[in-house]
Design a protein with these regions (language model features):
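Short, well-ordered beta-to-alpha junction loops that form the rim of enzyme active sites
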Residues: 173, 208-212, 244-245, 314
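N-terminal secretory signal peptides that target proteins for export/translocation
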Residues: 1-15
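N-terminal active-site segment of His-dependent metallophosphoesterases
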Residues: 32-106, 187, 195, 215-216
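Short, solvent-exposed aromatic-acidic interface loops
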Residues: 312-321
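C-terminal motif of bacterial Sec signal peptides marking the signal peptidase cleavage site
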Residues: 26-27
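Sec-dependent signal peptide recognition
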Residues: 16-22
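Active-site flanking residues adjacent to catalytic metal/cofactor-binding acidic residues
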Residues: 58-59, 95-96, 131, 209, ...
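Extended active-site neighborhood of metal-dependent phosphoesterases/phosphodiesterases
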Residues: 73-76, 99-205, 220-239, 247-301, ...
Length: 329
């Protein structure tokens, strides 16, 4: 694939911000509707001492697109800058890592030249999750072979790890949504999740997977993810990342039935902008949808501090379309 020009990434948290309260671009260009910082907002994010960084996206590599090459360059640039500053980094993927079917050939021809490029830092810190496209080939066997132990136990794909002071949970949403999955396997993941959360009673927790519980995109929210969301909500989990729909969207904290919950609700980020064909939004927008960006490849960078976090959605030029901060429950 052809290499895009290098994105603007000048250092830890030093990215351009658009000083507008609301942007709505239509007509010829990509449509963007997102709440942005006020005009007097600082031009750089405030660093969180001792924080770890999660950066990634979903719906990534395709041999018919150069979007994955651009997002790979962006992620690698951030990793390089953060590493120079001694920041702990982890790269997440939100499923559909490679198109069209997640075969070994797809990984070799389409993923390796961009996100899997050994000259980049991505594979050193990658923590993937599987999507439905990986399961189109031998029930994701090539995915597990490609990523090895970093993908969790073959056939399961769920695992957890530590990032700074945060607990991070990775789930296989295909086990929750596919009618091909035996009920026993679905329950096994749910039981594992309950045990894992009980064994790691940290104040701050983030979980990620492929199919979103809530979405204003063409696929829409996936009701079969409600049991997982309920477990997370009951345990006081703070953040969820998902993909599947090919746009960016941030939601207000909510319960499993889209009830606004500012005290214990889970905040979902949908980031399906890694390189697969971008898609639009549907009206009316999903309840509690707070920010939406369509028509831009990009990644989510979340800085995980002690009891707090900062988030920023960057497109492949380094421009930040949505940013903010929050505190853990």
């Amino acid at each position: 694939m052809e290499r895009a020009s290098a994105p603007l990434v000048t250092g830890v948290g030093q990215h351009r911000y658009r000083a507008l309260a609301l942007v709505l671009l239509v007509a010829c260009g990509p449509r963007v509707e997102v709440s942005l910082p006020p005009a007097d907002a600082p031009a750089t994010a405030v660093a969180i001492a001792g924080a770890a960084v999660l950066i990634g996206t979903g719906d990534i590599a395709s041999c018919t697109s150069t979007g994955d090459e651009a997002t790979a360059q962006l992620v690698d640039s951030v990793l390089k800058a953060d590493s120079a500053a001694g920041v702990e980094n982890h790269v997440f993927t939100l499923g559909d890592n490679v198109y069209p079917r997640g075969s070994a050939r797809d990984f070799e021809r389409c993923f390796t030249p961009s996100w899997g490029d050994p000259t980049r830092r991505i594979m050193k810190w990658i923590r993937p999750s599987p999507g439905n496209h990986e399961h189109d080939t031998d029930w994701a066997a090539p995915y597990y072979r490609y990523f090895g132990a970093r993908a969790g136990e073959p056939g399961k794909g769920y695992y957890s790890y530590k990032a700074g002071e945060w607990h991070v949970v990775v789930l296989n949403s295909v086990l929750a949504v596919s009618p091909r999955v035996p009920a026993a396997d679905r329950r096994a993941q749910e039981d594992w999740l309950r045990r894992d959360l009980a064994e790691h009673p940290t104040r701050c927790t983030v979980a990620y997977w492929h199919h979103p519980r809530f979405s204003s995109g063409t696929h829409g929210g996936v009701i079969r993810m409600e049991p997982i969301w309920r477990i997370l909500h009951d345990a006081g989990v703070d953040l969820v990342f998902a993909g599947h729909d090919h746009h960016y969207e941030r939601f207000l904290p909510q319960g499993p039935n889209a009830t606004l919950d500012t005290l214990r609700g889970v905040t979902q980020f949908l980031v399906g902008t890694g390189g697969g064909t971008l898609r639009g939004l549907r009206r009316p927008y999903a309840r509690n949808s707070a920010a939406r960006v369509q028509g831009h490849f990009g990644v989510l960078k979340v800085t995980l501090g002690s009891g707090e976090y900062q988030h920023a959605f960057l497109d492949v030029t380094g421009r930040v379309w949505d940013r903010g901060r929050g505190r853990c429950h």
